[in-house]
Design a protein with these regions (language model features):
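Basic, amphipathic N-terminal segments that precede the first structured/catalytic domain
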Residues: 30, 43, 86-88
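N-terminal pre-Walker A segment at the start of P-loop NTPase domains
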Residues: 1-27, 73
Length: 201
């Protein structure tokens, strides 16, 4: 079976709406249209972080800002290369990655980050920019903090209106808030525990 990040065309031939022309789109049709939201679900050591990073790589060039929320981003070497790429991109855009943090261990800064994104999108609309700025949020290893998180649920349900995409992971399907589960654009499933299954919609 071909991994989703190696597929160049969406198997269902999904076409974006005219309004989605506001956002730059990735080259791979499988990840169109952005903004998007994808959950990566598998048991521990099931490859969730690896798959999330592969998808991030395919979306990287169309995102103006990438923010990481992870309890393990300092310890897990899998994040090091991405954090360096983000810092380099910020420097290229005249931003200081030391002053403008992009990696966090809790969702405390999420409201501020979303507020800033709304302001950037509105400024782009006021200028008449061809493409509006996009934000990619990575929520990894945050099990327990995604349940009942209304702010994160709003990203899934309304984030597309202000250019916010979300990639999140969980060891179980039910580790993700029910409102998020109902509205995610897609799932990437690895090996699940015997007691776990996809909920009926």
């Amino acid at each position: 079976m071909t991994p989703i990040w190696q597929m160049s065309k969406h198997p269902l031939e999904v076409k974006g709406a005219a309004s989605e022309k506001r956002w730059a789109q990735p080259r791979d049709e499988i990840f169109q249209p952005t903004p998007t939201s994808i959950a990566f679900i598998a048991i521990t050591t099931g490859g969730k972080t690896s798959q999330m990073l592969h998808v991030t790589d395919r979306l990287f060039n169309v995102m103006d800002r990438i923010v990481i929320f992870s309890h393990s981003h300092r310890l897990d070497p899998a994040w090091h290369d991405l954090k360096k790429r983000i810092a380099d991109k910020m420097l290229k855009n005249g931003e200081n990655p030391d002053a403008q943090k992009f990696a966090f261990e809790s969702f405390k800064e999420l409201p501020r980050i979303l507020s800033e994104q709304r302001e950037r999108v509105q400024a782009g609309k006021d200028r008449g920019d061809k493409h509006l700025p996009q934000l990619l949020i990575l929520a990894a290893d945050m099990l327990g903090e995604m349940q009942g998180n209304k702010m994160l649920s709003s990203v899934v349900t309304r984030g597309r209106h202000y250019g916010v995409s979300l990639l999140c992971d969980s060891q179980t399907v039910r580790g993700i808030d029910s409102q998020m589960r109902k509205n995610l654009a897609g799932y990437c499933l690895g090996r699940l525990s015997a007691a776990d299954s996809l909920p009926r919609q």
